[in-house]
């Protein structure tokens, strides 16, 4: 007797810091006519049976967060088969760190290794087409105020230029360099990763001076960052 063919899709919805989103909802359509939606479990996980050979598009959503999309092409394999797709959602209310953005030393030129992270941002903006964002570049407290402000502005504009060249409308983007004027506030995730920091600590120059040398360097690295902040969610919504 042949085993029953059961294909199962599993995964999680969580925010970019890695914490589950128990209020998440997933919308799912398939080329077999599937058109459904379902909520996730309290731990942000989900599990649903899928049909062998069917192609699916899934949209992960949660109130207060930007949408994320995944695609699945179920195989024709017989027996039990499992797939996993996770949805990582960016906050629509708080600044979001753009991981793995790198510039040439003391310049605004993006390195080639930044492309993957920026292309993910392009995909997110294409999917969330009614969103406008601020691109914010920050420096650490080393270097002069005017120099840091000029450098951070140029870096924010470099990111904006990249996105525009990839097809994102420039009027959806605002580039702002903050220099060293907006030090990073420690998040829960950061406090878990760096035990000498507490959630809510602000990495000011005065705070950093109280730390040992290695800890100071970590804080300077955390302050050197590029983030985006959602400004509007109604861009061309009523046109």
What are these language model-derived features?
Residues 135:
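Conserved phosphate/oxyanion-binding catalytic-loop motifs
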Residues 1-132, 171, 193-196, 202, ...:
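Periplasmic peptidoglycan-binding/tethering modules of Gram-negative envelope proteins
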């Amino acid at each position: 007797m042949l085993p029953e063919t059961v294909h199962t899709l599993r995964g999680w919805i969580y925010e970019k810091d890695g914490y589950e989103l128990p209020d998440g909802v997933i919308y799912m359509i398939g080329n077999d006519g599937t058109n459904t939606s379902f909520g996730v479990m309290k731990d942000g996980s989900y599990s649903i049976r899928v049909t062998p050979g069917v192609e699916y598009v899934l949209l992960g959503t949660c109130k207060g967060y930007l949408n994320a999309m995944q695609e699945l092409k179920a195989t024709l394999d017989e027996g039990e088969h499992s797939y996993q797709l996770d949805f990582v959602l960016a906050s629509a209310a708080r600044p979001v760190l753009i991981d793995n953005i790198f510039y040439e030393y003391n310049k605004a030129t993006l390195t080639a290794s930044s492309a993957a992270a920026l292309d993910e941002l392009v995909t997110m903006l294409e999917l969330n087409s009614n969103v406008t964002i601020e691109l914010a570049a920050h420096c650490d407290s080393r270097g002069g105020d005017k120099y840091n402000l000029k450098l951070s502005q140029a870096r924010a504009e470099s990111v904006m230029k990249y996105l525009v060249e990839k097809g994102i409308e420039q009027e959806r983007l605002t580039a702002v360099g903050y220099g060293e004027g907006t030090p990073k506030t420690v998040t829960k995730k950061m406090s878990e990763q760096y035990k000498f920091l507490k959630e809510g600590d602000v990495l000011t120059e005065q705070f950093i001076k109280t730390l040992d040398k290695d800890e100071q360097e970590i804080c300077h690295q955390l302050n050197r960052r590029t983030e985006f902040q959602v400004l509007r969610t109604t861009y061309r919504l009523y046109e």
